[in-house]
Amino acid sequence: MGVRNIERLIEQRIKENPINPDILNLEEKVVEIRRTTRVMEGGRRFSFSTLAIVGDRNGHVGFGHGKAREVPPSIAKAIADAKKRIIKVALIEGTVPHDVYGEYDSAVVLLKPARRGTGVVAGGPMRPVLELLGVTDVLAKIVGRTTNPNAVVRATFDALLKLKSPEEVAKVRGLEEEKIKSVYRIYAGGVPVR
């Protein structure tokens, strides 16, 4: 099937449910600043590429990329780009609702719900994405062959886009919403509702 275009999936989600970044209390985090060099006739020309994450720690998160000749404009562009790509993710009591894999190129990530008190067990660039999303308990692992921050962040967003809320699952399966929610609460370590 090839690589899924994460930007296209995010744009599609934004068209369905537009999110205004101005009303959210967003925090920003720079994941990576990379210096690139272009050799010209008169010498080398440096530029900087930045990957940034924004989120409100309440179910909204976005990522962006920025390039400029200096670091501060590169960061500003990355943050502005991230604010254009904010998505809403369904969380259950501070964790993800169910196990999910995300892929981008050779980066593969696994997100699993965790019981309350576990914390964010995630490494590399996955950690700031999950923290700014508002996840307090999760087990996450980079399963693929690459640890390239750009690919890992995109794979994490692919996984987040695949998450289904209890309401969506109940609708698809034709079950009662409360039954699905009680199962999700048990899975996430909360108190089951009877």
From Swiss-Prot:
SUPFAM superfamilies associated with the record: dsRNA-binding domain-like, Ribosomal protein S5 domain 2-like
Keywords: Ribonucleoprotein, Ribosomal protein, RNA-binding, rRNA-binding
Pfam families on file: Ribosomal_S5, Ribosomal_S5_C
Residue ranges of domain S5 DRBM in the record: 26-89
KW Nucleus (keyword) present: no
Superkingdom assignment: Bacteria
One BP term from GO: translation
Record InterPro entries: Ribosomal_Su5_D2-typ_SF (IPR020568), Ribosomal_uS5 (IPR000851), Ribosomal_uS5_bac-type (IPR005712), Ribosomal_uS5_C (IPR005324), Ribosomal_uS5_N (IPR013810), Ribosomal_uS5_N_CS (IPR018192), Ribsml_uS5_D2-typ_fold_subgr (IPR014721)
GO cellular component: small ribosomal subunit
GO molecular function, one term: rRNA binding
Domain notes: The N-terminal domain interacts with the head of the 30S subunit; the C-terminal domain interacts with the body and contacts protein S4. The interaction surface between S4 and S5 is involved in control of translational fidelity.
Assembly and binders: Part of the 30S ribosomal subunit. Contacts proteins S4 and S8.
Record family assignment: Belongs to the universal ribosomal protein uS5 family.
Function comment: With S4 and S12 plays an important role in translational accuracy. Located at the back of the 30S subunit body where it stabilizes the conformation of the head with respect to the body.
Name this protein carries in UniProt: Small ribosomal subunit protein uS5
Species annotation: Sulfurihydrogenibium sp. (strain YO3AOP1)
Originating gene: rpsE
